[in-house]
Amino acid sequence: MASGSRTKHSHHSSSQAQSSGTSNVNYKDSISKAIAQYTADARLHAVFEQSGESGKFFDYSQSVKTTTQSVPERQITAYLTKIQRGGHIQPFGCMIAVDEASFRVIAYSENACEMLSLTPQSVPSLEKCEILTIGTDVRTLFTPSSSVLLERAFGAREITLLNPIWIHSKNSGKPFYAILHRVDVGIVIDLEPARTEDPALSIAGAVQSQKLAVRAISHLQSLPGGDIKLLCDTVVESVRELTGYDRVMVYKFHEDEHGEVVAESKRSDLEPYIGLHYPATDIPQASRFLFKQNRVRMIVDCHATPVRVTQDESLMQPLCLVGSTLRAPHGCHAQYMANMGSIASLTLAVIINGNDEEAVGGGRNSMRLWGLVVGHHTSVRSIPFPLRYACEFLMQAFGLQLNMELQLASQLSEKHVLRTQTLLCDMLLRDSPPGIVTQSPSIMDLVKCDGAALYYQGKYYPLGVTPTEAQIKDIVEWLLAYHGDSTGLSTDSLPDAGYPGAASLGDAVCGMAVAYITSKDFLFWFRSHTAKEIKWGGAKHHPEDKDDGQRMHPRSSFKAFLEVVKSRSSPWENAEMDAIHSLQLILRDSFKDAEASNSKAIVHAHLGEMELQGIDELSSVAREMVRLIETATAPIFAVDVEGRINGWNAKVAELTGVSVEEAMGKSLVHDLVYKESQETAEKLLYNALRGEEDKNVEIKLRTFGAEQLEKAVFVVVNACASKDYTNNIVGVCFVGQDVTGEKVVMDKFINIQGDYKAIVHSPNPLIPPIFASDENTCCSEWNTAMEKLTGWSRGEIVGKMLVGEIFGSCCRLKGPDAMTKFMIVLHNAIGGQDTDKFPFSFFDRNGKYVQALLTANKRVNMEGDTIGAFCFIQIASPELQQALRVQRQQEKKCYSQMKELAYICQEIKSPLNGIRFTNSLLEATNLTENQKQYLETSAACERQMSKIIRDIDLENIEDGSLTLEKEDFFLGSVIDAVVSQVMLLLREKGVQLIRDIPEEIKTLTVHGDQVRIQQVLADFLLNMVRYAPSPDGWVEIQLRPSMMPISDGVTVVHIELRIICPGEGLPPELVQDMFHSSRWVTQEGLGLSMCRKMLKLMNGEIQYIRESERCYFLIILDLPMTRKGPKSVG
């Protein structure tokens, strides 16, 4: 179907069962599938070639049956050589290969002499030695100016970025697009006839093509997010509008390597191909590799006879044509095109970022071929190289947009999976295991399937389309017999997986994924055969098409695909297997924990490890950050959640004339910025406090003092949300750069004030690097600061193309995506749409990486007509770059901590359920009174821990919206639970605990949130024990209750609780964190601060009192007294 298509059937590459595992296993599996497909491709190619040599018709149906046969290694090598070094080109252009050092011709196409008018017949006066042959100096074939251009191109580092080069034949004067690329033995020059003889028109045409691509890109970027179908529909319309092909389609490659037409724009009278699925071998792996190397492929006329390439006999192997725009199509593909009535085609590769394993190698290896955008035409069609180049830019933008949409879809899917897993685990532990099948959500909601089942303790719980109980028992016996040492199994074909009873299941159950929970308990997911889900919107088979099963045609491709997937389900995707594997691990751990008795010890060990991990690193990062802020030569300031200054470094104080002391507490918006910047500053704050961090925003700061009167300071800032340990936003930090000098110059420059040349070429350090473009994106200005920044002189740069030639070849960019973005910015500016502070990075002449901000404005003449663009570059100071690096390091560490915390909160639930279950078993036994009290204390601690990890949202505590869960409880039970939490620490430190608590407290029943009160008191007591003198020290708990009757016969218990220790007590910074700081310094301080706020929510209060020889917490709390006792524990 698409360019590079060959024969039309693939033996399914995942026929054997695969064990469920991680994405790394899945990646290796995908590689093995691709390698296996190479064999199938080579076999089909050999069958096609043999049929041609023997004069027999290539029987499509018979070829389908032979793809499973093995292929000798030499046959695969021959096949790959044929694909990559076929020795023929298309006749719409000619090709010359040259030795790079000597310019000597080493190969040429047989039509080159005629096309370049070099034959003696066409030029009778031509000397024989000038006729093109092996060894000819290629420069003698073209005009002197053309030769100079070729010499310059040969010296370029990235030669392809200079394409196309406009050159003329020496003898005829005919113009050509020269498209150059390097191969292993030299440089290949593809020559395509140009349609105009004016080079200026050629450049203008190229720019016009780019403008059309930019317009299409802008349309793509304006689409609403979350709709990949709309994105694909839009891109086919844009490509068809750009190129004029009769039909344009988007092909998507699925994980099992087969393809599908997911979008189509066509002439109304053509048969639709939307919805067509085709076998993996329709586009062989070798062709897919070529698309990653050469992302645009044009076939002008499939009926045209390919032209042979003649080469130097000293070359060891045929010339590599992988990167050639003229490479001839393979015979089977040309035949396929002819059969479907498509004479010409254009194929554009859609490249997106690969997965983590693919990205290890970096560069092109980190990119993945997602699919193709293909244009078909019913007559001969050729589009010039500049337009094809513009289409390539459009594909890069489409790939970027698609990548973002795929990442968003993946994140939403992952959230759904995590939520479903959590609900299933909770359901399993709260109820009975069959609940994950019988209730909602069920295990069918985890992955796409037609049925699912649980086999638990010999009982069968089916849901949806599933085998019968007798059949599932047979499957379980087969699994234990042949896959007993595995942790799971997945297959899209039970017959191919070797299950002997597959025939009895029919088409209803073809694919199966199974997860072993224990050696006797299993989870199953089932899928029916694929064909029932796939429909093609194309025309029905016509009775007159008698050879339809044998001819290579889209309809026969679809038929072949249905044959391939017969008795198969859709394959289990990597993400689906990861979800199943994750649920399996969680359930296995849950089953074990419910049976184990030492779960509590595991929880404590895990929590202890979590508490210590990473603290030293975070402290180090925090100290480094503070030092950088204080000493930086970049202006840095910070505000709290109300927008008031709480950080103000020396540089911003110097710029504004406002000292640190004067700035503290002032409103950034109302006191420190100009009126015209107030809206911008308010938006910055609003977004940052919601977690959206704006970058490169310009604000105008006021200045104070006699010397600063009526001056303004312009700073470009990045807004960074300041977060506490639990990821709550507590303020905003602004890391800025002073651009006042550049701003003044730029304003004068744009308004054509002052002496133009004096401004541009001034060596004054306040003059920023400036370059300019004419209407055709050629460089027309390159100032002194730009020379210093890049290492390239004005004379070397002016007149060259900014996109590709300057930024691309001279100043290398990081990949084609960066060039696409730069091209869009430049064309937008020429079109009147200014771009401000665009992140722009490149390598200078010496290979140093330069990170900058690019501002592009339209350039007008005295009459107001647009004549190009001005571009200004701002460079971040070293201090700012270091500050940003440290900020990213801190964010990464905080994110890592958050992930670990989320993991702990999730994983700790199962051991806690195990403790709860153990407690419930103990309650049913004969216990002494003391044992009952211990059990009650254990249950109280377990409830406290469950509530902490369930309600971890500190923001609700901060703003006073935490929901309290009130109940009746014994006050004595709370005290016992609180004391139990410090007993181990007391023993370790050798500290004595003194309890001065009235006996009646034990049976006093009150009403309130027992778990929160217990949490608060335990934290205060724990911190006092931590800082008590050791050894031989002591801590005293002194409780004084009093009864206060109020209206309606209700009595309130007024509690005064003192926690006392001798000596100095808590460190001052801990007390500071507890009472005053919104940006805590210590973990203990955060805990005490949260507990103080929780106590306040319960209408209580806390004081910390330091006396000469002792210190103590004084906790005051009023709780309503109740007459009935609390419900039984458990």
From Swiss-Prot:
Domain (GAF) ranges: 227-406
Keyword Ribosomal protein listed: no
Record PTM: Contains one covalently linked phytochromobilin chromophore.
Record flagged with keyword Transport: no
PROSITE patterns: HIS_KIN (PS50109), PAS (PS50112), PHYTOCHROME_1 (PS00245), PHYTOCHROME_2 (PS50046)
Database matches in Gene3D superfamilies: 1.10.287.130, 3.30.450.270, 3.30.450.40, Histidine kinase-like ATPase, C-terminal domain, PAS domain
Domain PAS: 621-692, 755-826
InterPro entries hit by this protein: GAF, GAF-like_dom_sf, HATPase_C_sf, His_kinase_dom, HisK_dim/P_dom, HisK_dim/P_sf, PAS, PAS-like_dom_sf
GO biological process, one term: regulation of DNA-templated transcription
Sites where the protein binds phytochromobilin: 332
GO cellular component: nucleus
Segments of this protein annotated with the region Disordered: 1-25
Keyword annotations of the record: Chromophore, Photoreceptor protein, Receptor, Repeat, Sensory transduction, Transcription, Transcription regulation
GO molecular function: phosphorelay sensor kinase activity; photoreceptor activity; protein homodimerization activity
UniProt similarity note: Belongs to the phytochrome family.
Function of the protein: Regulatory photoreceptor which exists in two forms that are reversibly interconvertible by light: the Pr form that absorbs maximally in the red region of the spectrum and the Pfr form that absorbs maximally in the far-red region. Photoconversion of Pr to Pfr induces an array of morphogenic responses, whereas reconversion of Pfr to Pr cancels the induction of those responses. Pfr controls the expression of a number of nuclear genes including those encoding the small subunit of ribulose-bisphosphate carboxylase, chlorophyll A/B binding protein, protochlorophyllide reductase, rRNA, etc.
Protein name: Phytochrome B
Source organism per UniProt: Solanum tuberosum
Phylogenetic placement of the source organism: Eukaryota, Viridiplantae, Streptophyta, Embryophyta, Tracheophyta
